[in-house]
Amino acid sequence: MAKYNEKELADTSKFLSFVLRHKPESIGIVLDREGWADIDKLILCAQKAGKRLTRALLDTVVATSDKKRFSYSSDGRCIRAVQGHSTSQVAISFAEKTPPQFLYHGTASRFLDEIKKQGLIAGERHYVHLSADEATARKVGARHGSPVILTVKAQEMAKRGLPFWQAENGVWLTSTVAVEFLEWPFMPAGLQKQ
């Protein structure tokens, strides 16, 4: 595997996330319904758009991503973002799965007022993303400000017929989480649910 510096890997991962999750048309590629992009076409279109991208760089990003954001097709000819899509081109068909008793959602404290009103919604993405552990949720929440960890009563939701799916990188997905299925134990005292 070729050597790349951390900035180059991070920049490429962000570029791939943008193109493979949100705006494939920004460089002129089309994703299939399962989110797959032809690697040769991706590289060519990225280079035409001024982005330095090679197969070796892709291989390194896919292999070293701590969150396993991307995967290759079994024949190695296509790549996709594992989850997190907002583009209408993609509708990955995940297998429904029974969740553990609790899952976790990391968010920034500035979003809590809205969450208290409407629960967790997918927003521009196709699903609400949940973590199996608090540490991962804390990292996610810290990306947007002072992190707050919300506990989701996942098994209770599933017992009421609300479906869950799990992406191949371990991220749990659901359509929405109503306020009644949220626990707020890690909130600052001034932000406690009324």
Swiss-Prot record:
* Molecular function GO terms recorded: NAD+ poly-ADP-ribosyltransferase activity; tRNA 2'-phosphotransferase activity
Query: GO biological process annotations for this chain's record?
Result: tRNA splicing, via endonucleolytic cleavage and ligation
Question: Domain of life here?
Answer: Bacteria
Which EC numbers characterise this protein's activity in its record? 2.7.1.-
Write out the entry's keywords from A to Z: NAD, Transferase
Q: What are the annotated disulfide bridges?
A: none
Q: According to the UniProt record, what class of enzyme is this?
A: transferase
Matching entries from Pfam families are given as: PTS_2-RNA
Family of this protein: Belongs to the KptA/TPT1 family.
What does this gene product do? Removes the 2'-phosphate from RNA via an intermediate in which the phosphate is ADP-ribosylated by NAD followed by a presumed transesterification to release the RNA and generate ADP-ribose 1''-2''-cyclic phosphate (APPR>P). May function as an ADP-ribosylase.
What this protein is called in its record is Probable RNA 2'-phosphotransferase
Organism in which the protein naturally occurs: Escherichia coli (strain SMS-3-5 / SECEC)
